């Protein structure tokens, strides 16, 4: 059974932006329902909710040619639309709500080049409850970095999504459980009841 120290736990809802949700989660209603329920339970239990989103300045100066993943964004107006305007905002079903923190990143991991670690240290956070889109992107990258920084990670498997279902399942089944507690949304809600 999952046990969380409420004073030292934060939940990271990662890359759950309107444009990304529309591309990666079909249909999105069940995913958004589970994620919204988790965030509601976390807020009610006074856990810190942190939304991590991908975003860039006009002209995309954060993206260099050597970054294979994001170089495609720089050359494609279609990809840029995923991060621009309302499509780049946190999905309205999830927040942000008063008290939530929004961290903008320019790479895959929630930690790379952001002030996330400073926020976590300032709040004496030791446990990170992670979910988001994509399992093989931000979730994997943030999990590995969190482990290396000695956080105690929890992955909400049914609040993660990936375009590649086989890769998603392999990560959840074969890798994540070696580095984190892997639970479902109902487990987090029950732990906070």
Q: What does each of the following model-derived ranges do?
A:
Residues 1-10, 37-45, 70-193:
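Active-site-adjacent betaalpha module
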Residues 7-9, 25-42, 46-55:
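A short alpha/beta connector and helix-capping loop motif
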Residues 10-16:
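Acidic-leg catalytic submotif of subtilisin-like serine proteases
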Residues 16, 54, 158:
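Active-site loop/turn elements of alpha/beta-hydrolase fold enzymes
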Residues 17-23:
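Short acidic, Gly/Ser-rich segments with clustered Asp/Glu that frequently serve as metal-coordination loops
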Residues 19, 57, 162:
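Active-site loop signature of alpha/beta-hydrolase-fold enzymes
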Residues 55-61:
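Short, solvent-exposed beta-strand-terminating loops
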Residues 62-70:
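Short, flexible, mixed-charge acidic loops at enzyme active sites
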């Amino acid at each position: 059974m999952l046990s969380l120290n409420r004073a030292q736990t934060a939940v990271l809802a990662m890359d759950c932006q309107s444009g990304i949700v529309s591309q990666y989660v079909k249909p999105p209603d069940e995913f958004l329902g589970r994620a919204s329920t988790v965030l509601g339970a976390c807020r009610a239990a006074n856990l810190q909710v942190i939304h991590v989103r991908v975003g860039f300045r006009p002209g995309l100066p954060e993206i260099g040619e050597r970054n294979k993943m994001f170089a495609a964004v720089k050359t494609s107006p279609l990809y840029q639309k995923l991060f621009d305007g309302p499509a780049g905002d946190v999905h309205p079903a999830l927040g942000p709500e008063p008290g939530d923190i929004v961290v903008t990143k320019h790479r895959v991991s929630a930690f790379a080049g952001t002030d996330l670690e400073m926020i976590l240290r300032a709040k004496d956070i030791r446990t990170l409850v992670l979910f988001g889109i994509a399992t093989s992107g931000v979730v994997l990258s943030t999990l590995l970095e969190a482990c290396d920084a000695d956080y105690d990670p929890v992955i909400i498997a049914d609040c993660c999504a990936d375009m590649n279902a086989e890769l998603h399942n392999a990560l959840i089944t074969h890798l994540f459980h070696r580095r984190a507690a892997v639970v479902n949304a109902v487990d987090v809600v029950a732990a906070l009841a």
